[in-house]
């Protein structure tokens, strides 16, 4: 048995190819069933996200396993092998182990150290558990990878600093305001960045969120998820004074929030401070707003400066994280190798027990027929000894006959002959 990881990710293929090899949540169960029907595949996990599609497998050793798995992947997704073969990567044994640990810890992510990938790996693992698609080795590997990811989070600073625009915007808000729990937030736009911002803010339990968007339909989907109120862009003017924090990210070619609008809001707020974070390009908020007293305006460039500084901190933390992964992968491989000994010991004990049971049955039968008990016990001990030492004796004779000194010494060590 060997552990194998193969996949395609943001570093090896463009999105135009990645989207063609992705597995939808609805298809995972069927894909696992199909995968385990392949010859010599003993267990599998399918991890599929927007940035990667990976298969983690326990397989029997086979010379053409690569060709077999590429063929399965291409048939499943209706692709030609030449379309994907150059973008696929393969990891075996220790490399497969350390790769999964790196993935779960966020060390292989597009955004270094991002935490979302761990949840995605756990979900993929749970899917295989439900479908009974795991081998014992794979189950142990994934459980170990989860504990490694936890170690990386707790023992390093890999996730302490914001390295995405959305996360940086929320981090900035938490730095300026002591608590977000009593604050109202206005989000302008309903695209991917605002979605991430809204989810971050929900985690920090802001008092109230308002989402302003050109169309209500798209905003309503997000609002339903995070528990927010929806307004249209023209309604911003009358609701701006309600907001302590404004975060804007639209595709508008012209500013949506002007200096006059903010002046009116500040007056209505009796000059209570407002934080405005403009992460749109072109800008959604007129730059002159930053000159107003009690209006604290930050642009996407300000956030990028924060991100670059924090990214350097994450890269430094990643060195420590890689050391954790390296040590844990070595420990796991030592455990995996020991499983071969466990099976051998189990077989050896089973063989010895079978011999004992056979000799015992003969002895009891002899006693039942009236044989002398002392003589039966003597013969039992003699025959049992001969049966148990028969195979080791043949191995010793073979090694001696071949002049194999190393093997002879290994057998002596195994039998404990030099311990007394």
UniProtKB/Swiss-Prot annotation:
NADP(+) binds at residues 189-194. The active site is at residue 50. It comes from the Bacteria. CDD domains: NAD_bind_Glutamyl_tRNA_reduct. Its EC number is 1.2.1.70. GO terms for molecular function: glutamyl-tRNA reductase activity; NADP binding. Pathway: Porphyrin-containing compound metabolism; protoporphyrin-IX biosynthesis; 5-aminolevulinate from L-glutamyl-tRNA(Glu): step 1/2. Keywords: NADP, Oxidoreductase, Porphyrin biosynthesis. It is an enzyme of class 1 (oxidoreductase). The record marks 99 as: Important for activity. Pfam families: GlutR_dimer, GlutR_N, Shikimate_DH. Substrate binds at residues 49-52, 109, 114-116, 120. InterPro entries: 4pyrrol_synth_GluRdtase (IPR000343), 4pyrrol_synth_GluRdtase_dimer (IPR015896), 4pyrrol_synth_GluRdtase_N (IPR015895), GluRdtase_CS (IPR018214), GluRdtase_dimer_dom_sf (IPR036453), GluRdtase_N_sf (IPR036343), NAD(P)-bd_dom_sf (IPR036291), Shikm_DH/Glu-tRNA_Rdtase (IPR006151). Possesses an unusual extended V-shaped dimeric structure with each monomer consisting of three distinct domains arranged along a curved 'spinal' alpha-helix. The N-terminal catalytic domain specifically recognizes the glutamate moiety of the substrate. The second domain is the NADPH-binding domain, and the third C-terminal domain is responsible for dimerization. Homodimer. Belongs to the glutamyl-tRNA reductase family. During catalysis, the active site Cys acts as a nucleophile attacking the alpha-carbonyl group of tRNA-bound glutamate with the formation of a thioester intermediate between enzyme and glutamate, and the concomitant release of tRNA(Glu). The thioester intermediate is finally reduced by direct hydride transfer from NADPH, to form the product GSA. Catalyzes the NADPH-dependent reduction of glutamyl-tRNA(Glu) to glutamate 1-semialdehyde (GSA). This is Glutamyl-tRNA reductase. The lineage of its organism: Bacteria, Pseudomonadati, Pseudomonadota, Gammaproteobacteria, Enterobacterales.
């Amino acid at each position: 048995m060997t552990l194998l990881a193969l996949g395609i990710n943001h570093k090896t293929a463009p999105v135009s190819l990645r989207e063609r090899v992705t597995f939808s949540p609805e298809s995972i169960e069927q894909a696992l069933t199909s995968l385990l029907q392949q010859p010599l595949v003993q267990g599998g996990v399918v991890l599929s996200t927007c940035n990667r599609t990976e298969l983690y497998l326990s397989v029997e050793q086979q010379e053409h396993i690569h060709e077999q798995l590429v063929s399965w992947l291409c048939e499943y997704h209706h692709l030609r092998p030449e379309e994907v073969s150059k973008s696929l990567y393969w990891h075996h044994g220790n490399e497969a182990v350390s790769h999964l640990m790196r993935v779960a810890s966020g060390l292989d992510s597009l955004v270094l150290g991002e935490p979302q990938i761990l949840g995605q790996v756990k979900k993929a693992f749970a899917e295989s558990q439900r479908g009974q698609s795991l081998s014992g080795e794979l189950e142990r590997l994934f459980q170990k990878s989860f504990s490694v990811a936890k170690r990386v989070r707790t023992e390093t600073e890999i996730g302490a600093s914001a390295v995405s625009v959305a996360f940086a915007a929320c981090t900035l808000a938490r730095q300026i305001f002591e608590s977000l729990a009593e604050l109202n937030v206005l989000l302008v736009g309903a695209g991917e960045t605002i979605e991430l911002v809204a989810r971050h803010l929900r985690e920090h339990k802001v008092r109230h969120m308002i989402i302003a968007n050109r169309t209500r339909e798209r905003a309503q989907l997000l609002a339903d998820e995070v528990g927010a109120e929806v307004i249209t862009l023209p309604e911003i003017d009358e609701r701006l004074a309600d907001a302590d924090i404004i975060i804007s990210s639209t595709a508008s070619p012209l500013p949506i929030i002007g200096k006059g609008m903010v002046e009116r809001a500040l007056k209505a707020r009796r000059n209570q401070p407002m934080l405005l974070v403009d992460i749109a390009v072109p800008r959604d908020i007129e730059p002159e707003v930053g000159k107003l007293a009690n209006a604290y305006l930050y642009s996407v460039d300000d956030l990028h400066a924060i991100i670059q500084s924090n990214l350097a901190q994450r890269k430094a933390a990643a060195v420590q994280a890689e050391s954790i992964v390296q040590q844990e992968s070595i420990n796991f491989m030592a455990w995996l190798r020991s499983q071969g000994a466990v099976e051998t010991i189990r077989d050896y004990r089973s063989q010895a027990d079978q011999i004992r049971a056979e000799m015992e049955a003969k002895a009891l039968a002899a006693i039942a027929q009236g044989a002398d008990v002392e003589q039966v016990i003597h013969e039992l001990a003699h025959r049992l000894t001969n049966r148990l030492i028969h195979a080791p004796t043949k191995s010793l004779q073979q090694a001696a006959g071949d002049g194999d000194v190393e093997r002879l010494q290994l057998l002596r060590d195994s039998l404990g002959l030099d311990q007394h």
